[in-house]
């Protein structure tokens, strides 16, 4: 039996009575953002809108992006990454559960020294994939060229954000590489592993 999104009380400053808001809206007011699903255009636009709004509201107070995602679409994910780099406040990234594929890319995109993984979190990197089987031959070639450009772009970002040599990142992206939190720290995707 689904219970929906839980509601919590929230009192606006200067108001006597609290109103009930869903838990995510309450957490957004504290600058805590959540990516708890596959990356697609809808969640990308929501997170971008929240980051821009909160940045305008207060450009000195940090944002916190909690990630538990199996990955998803590259272009919407890169849009989130670019926004993280663009907004004035530092964006902390926190991996809880899984940050795979585009999720790990966003995890690495947090402010350097402010990227964290919970102790039992898992991180996975790999190269971008496509649905070639649905394309005609001409489209297949164009899509392959675009995919190679995307792979090169993602690889360059991983190199910049992790400090690893290009050949190491390129080799790791050839296949699915799963890491524990401490392995992700050694790889430069996160800076800290949370402890009690």
UniProtKB/Swiss-Prot annotation:
Organism (species): Gossypium hirsutum
Protein name as it appears in the record: ATP-dependent Clp protease proteolytic subunit
Biological function: Cleaves peptides in various proteins in a process that requires ATP hydrolysis. Has a chymotrypsin-like activity. Plays a major role in the degradation of misfolded proteins.
Matches recorded under Pfam families: CLP_protease (PF00574)
Main location: plastid
Subcellular location: Plastid, Chloroplast stroma
Taxonomic superkingdom: Eukaryota
Keyword Protease part of the UniProt annotation: yes
Subunit structure: Component of the chloroplastic Clp protease core complex.
């Amino acid at each position: 039996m689904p219970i929906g999104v839980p509601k919590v009380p929230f009192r606006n400053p200067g108001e006597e009575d609290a109103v009930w808001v869903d838990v995510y809206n309450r957490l957004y007011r504290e600058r805590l953002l959540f990516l708890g699903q596959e990356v697609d255009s809808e969640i990308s636009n929501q997170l971008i809108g929240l980051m821009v709004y909160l940045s305008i509201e207060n450009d000195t107070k940090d944002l916190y992006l909690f990630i538990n995602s199996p990955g998803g679409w590259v272009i919407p994910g890169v849009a989130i990454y670019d926004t993280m780099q663009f907004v004035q406040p530092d964006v902390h990234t926190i991996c809880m559960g899984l940050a795979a594929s585009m999720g790990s890319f966003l995890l690495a995109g947090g402010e350097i020294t402010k990227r964290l993984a919970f102790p039992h979190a898992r991180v996975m990197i790999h190269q971008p994939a496509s649905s070639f089987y649905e394309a005609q031959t001409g489209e297949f070639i164009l899509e392959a060229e675009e995919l190679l450009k995307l792979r090169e772009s993602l690889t360059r970002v991983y190199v910049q954000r992790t400090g690893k040599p290009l050949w190491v990142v390129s080799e790791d992206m050839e296949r699915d590489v799963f890491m524990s939190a401490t392995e992700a720290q050694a790889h430069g995707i996160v800076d800290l592993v949370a402890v009690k």
